[in-house]
Amino acid sequence: MIEKIKVLAADVDMTLSAKSSPLPEITIQALKELHNRNVKIGLATGREITETEKTKGMFWKLGFEFDFIIGINGGMIYDRNLDKTFTMDMMSIEEMKEVLTFLMPIIEEKKVSINVEGNQLRNVMNISDDLL
């Protein structure tokens, strides 16, 4: 069965490891085995792709870096082979304000929060208090 596996993408937090924790030894051994069998291994995360994500393999003492990273839930993709990050067109702050103004009744009723990412800066803010 393992011979058929060509690519593996795994979420980081609470999948490969507990938040900010080292990888369990069994996970390290499994990833090394897949890497030795030439399986392309990547990370998938809701976070923006930064140098921290690009060096997770060494941080976790795998002996190799991940082949690719899917960031911002698909909004960014890093290809190690090309050493290039591809990004989707993101909404501008002005476009975001327009959409959120339209949705304000729901936002206020449900007490919705939003995760805004960009330029390697991540802020969690309450839309009704901080953005509009």
Language-model segments: what does each one mean?
Residues 1-5, 36:
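Short, Lys/Arg-enriched, disordered terminal segments
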Residues 4, 131-132:
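A generic hydrophobic-segment detector
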Residues 4-21, 43:
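Asp-based phosphoryl-transfer active-site loop
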Residues 27-130:
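Active-site phosphate-binding/coordination module
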